[in-house]
Amino acid sequence: MPPIRANKAKEKLAAGQAVTTISGLSSSEIIDFMGPLGFDAAWIEGEHGSVTWEQLGDMTRACDLWEMAPITRVSANEPWLVTRTLDRGSMGIVVPHVNTKEAAEKAAQSAKYAPLGYRGMFGGRQSYGVGDYFQQANDQTMVIVLLEEDEALNNLDEILTVDHIDVFFVAPTDLAQTMGHLGNPGHPEVQRAIEGAIAKILSAGRVAGTLVNDENVGRFLGQGVKYTMTSWNAWVAQGAAAFLEKVAGTKI
């Protein structure tokens, strides 16, 4: 029997390479458009987006076609939600608001079968035709925890002791809110906190991730961030603005 599909993002992290993840995806058609561009993973939005369970299955299939790892952000750190998300074809989960060691342990154990955790025994789409699926799923499934509150940074030393977490992702926007800088993740205090968290993650021998854009991606990669997530929306907005400016400035 064939092996489970390889998780490209997890393989690149294991090789010490940077991973590129594209977000802002709401349909399988958009994933098909993004697929040929070469991103390693697709960030499917289950917390802030409108993706249904039926759509999630189709979107993860589209990721499989383009060898992009389907990584889905769930809306809560709940075992049943993690299980169903993985059963629908996701090869990784992003768990929001992980502020304590106990929350990190819950996230990791919800995504793994025994003896590593207690993910519900079913398997779903990625298990079809795969021998020894449960062990292979444990090897290929990614767990990403979001550090998006100042409480998480205060407890970071303990959180970093939790096994079977692939990426500790420092989320700037929510972090800024909890630090008293609503809507201003670029505030120097927030940026210092992000950089300090990244340094602590790396010093513990773990993988750091964060949100990046064209302006700061080089800086974060230089700091040692290996898991990057960005959105295509800004590129469309920039291109549209440039196009409209050219039209407005052309005499006819």
Residue ranges and their predicted role:
Residues 1-23, 130-139, 195-203, 252:
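N-terminal amphipathic alpha-helix/helix-capping segment at the start of soluble metabolic enzymes
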Residues 20-23, 42-44, 70-74, 93-95, ...:
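Hydrophobic faces of well-ordered beta-strands that scaffold small-molecule active sites
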Residues 80, 90-167, 172-177, 251:
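Conserved anion-binding
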Residues 23-37, 76-84, 151-162, 212-218:
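Short, acidic/polar
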Residues 22, 34, 45, 93, ...:
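Conserved, mostly hydrophobic/aromatic
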Residues 1-70, 74-77, 143, 164:
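Conserved N-terminal beta1-alpha1 strand-loop-helix module at the mouth
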Residues 89-92, 112-120, 178-192, 229, ...:
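Glycine-rich tight-turn/loop motif centered on a GG-T
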Residues 59, 63, 101-116, 233-252:
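C-terminal helical cap(s) of enzyme catalytic domains, especially alpha/beta-barrels
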